[in-house]
Amino acid sequence: MPVLTDPLQILQALIRCPSVTPHEAGALSTLEQFLTKMGFHVERPIFADKNTEDVENLYAKMGKEGPHLMFAGHTDVVPPGDLENWKYPPFEGVIDQGKLYGRGAVDMKGGIACFVAAFARVLEKRTIKGRVSLLITGDEEGPALNGTVKLLKWAEQKGEKWTAALVGEPTSVKTVGDVIKIGRRGSISGIMTVKGRQGHVAFPERAANPLPLASKLIQSLIQTTLDEGTENFQPSNLELTAIDTGNPAMNVIPAQATVHFNIRYNDLWTKEMLMAEIENRLALVQSKNNNGQYPYYQLEWIPSLGDVFLTKNDKLINTLSNAIKSVTGNIPECSTSGGTSDARFIKDYCPVIEFGLPGQTMHMVDECVTVDAMETLTSIYECFIVDFFA
């Protein structure tokens, strides 16, 4: 059993569980052993959904009264890729020249290890007047259908309510504590299919080429910016992610063209407003091009679980910022940049902020974290916990 105040030993134990999403591979069981030894009551609900594998989750709680701090995270990791490219095996947790290597070291077993060690250090020195829980899923890197979103609902039905939540995602950029996340942009994806009529390129009058209309529709999506951004958010942006005709032949006019796109949007928009804006742009182009005759387009919106949000709880933000300053001497930047995370689910239950290790190597070959970064984050978490319950 690792020394529970040592984040490196905890992280090594977690990394040695090859928990490639959505497989548990012993990671939650290992974490449960640590938490049980510390005095937590641990439960392991399993959730399922159609066309997905069952996923194990963990909810651990200590305390019965007072403010309730939730720490949220995930033990599932992305695949390591070609093992030949790794300096050290990705599931051994080798420490070399001040760095600990392994898949999940940064995203985000390292954050979990630091919080567990931080809380163990707190318990050695004082009694917390409040409640602490860990909400840990094995389905964050995958479709995120059987993880945090269901675990929150399950816990709420059991009477759980939280004062605030800290998500241990790797938010830092260059050094531990330089950036915390106080919100996230929303995300929505669409598939536009432009229908034509297949034919021989030598006889275009017998066909209806979907590509000229597709190019005009694409231009309507990208030529005008959605907005200029806000005080707390970057400008919303639409990115094309795929264009395909399924036609490798040089002498065939394709039957259709398919365009995939994703939009990351700020708090100037709701999902419904944004969908209406895109639909209006496309309809205007179509009305000038045969108005529903071949070629024409169809638009499908992909269900999204990522709405835009901004945490405005000054007390929570200041408590974390002050903890960072007391350990590092620096004041963190409050940011909303980057992709989505499970904070998008938690924000419906309590104020939530995100803070963790530097993320330069996450999802990469030779993912690693420095020994110094682990100690710094553990110290900040410890200070934050103490101040939260002060």
From Swiss-Prot:
KW Hydrolase (keyword) present: yes
Name of the top EC class for this enzyme: hydrolase
Cofactor: Zn(2+); Co(2+)
Associated pathway: Amino-acid biosynthesis; L-lysine biosynthesis via DAP pathway; LL-2,6-diaminopimelate from (S)-tetrahydrodipicolinate (succinylase route): step 3/3
Residues making up the signal peptide according to the UniProt record: none
UniProt remark on cofactor binding: Binds 2 Zn(2+) or Co(2+) ions per subunit.
Keywords, comma-separated and alphabetical: Amino-acid biosynthesis, Cobalt, Diaminopimelate biosynthesis, Hydrolase, Lysine biosynthesis, Metal-binding, Zinc
Active site, per annotation: 76, 140
EC number: 3.5.1.18
Chain sites annotated for binding Zn(2+) 2: 107, 141, 363
Source organism, top-level taxon: Bacteria
Pfam families: M20_dimer, Peptidase_M20
Record-level GO BP terms: diaminopimelate biosynthetic process; L-arginine biosynthetic process; lysine biosynthetic process via diaminopimelate
Recorded GO MF terms: acetylornithine deacetylase activity; cobalt ion binding; succinyl-diaminopimelate desuccinylase activity; zinc ion binding
Xref: SUPFAM superfamilies: Bacterial exopeptidase dimerisation domain, Zn-dependent exopeptidases
Sites where the protein binds Zn(2+) 1: 74, 107, 169
Catalytic activity: N-succinyl-(2S,6S)-2,6-diaminopimelate + H2O = (2S,6S)-2,6-diaminopimelate + succinate
InterPro entries: ArgE/DapE, ArgE/DapE_CS, Bact_exopeptidase_dim_dom, DapE_proteobac, Peptidase_M20, Peptidase_M20_dimer, Peptidase_M20A
Family statement: Belongs to the peptidase M20A family. DapE subfamily.
Binding partners and assembly: Homodimer.
Function per UniProt: Catalyzes the hydrolysis of N-succinyl-L,L-diaminopimelic acid (SDAP), forming succinate and LL-2,6-diaminopimelate (DAP), an intermediate involved in the bacterial biosynthesis of lysine and meso-diaminopimelic acid, an essential component of bacterial cell walls.
Protein name according to UniProt: Succinyl-diaminopimelate desuccinylase
Protein source organism: Bartonella henselae (strain ATCC 49882 / DSM 28221 / CCUG 30454 / Houston 1)
Lineage: Bacteria, Pseudomonadati, Pseudomonadota, Alphaproteobacteria, Hyphomicrobiales
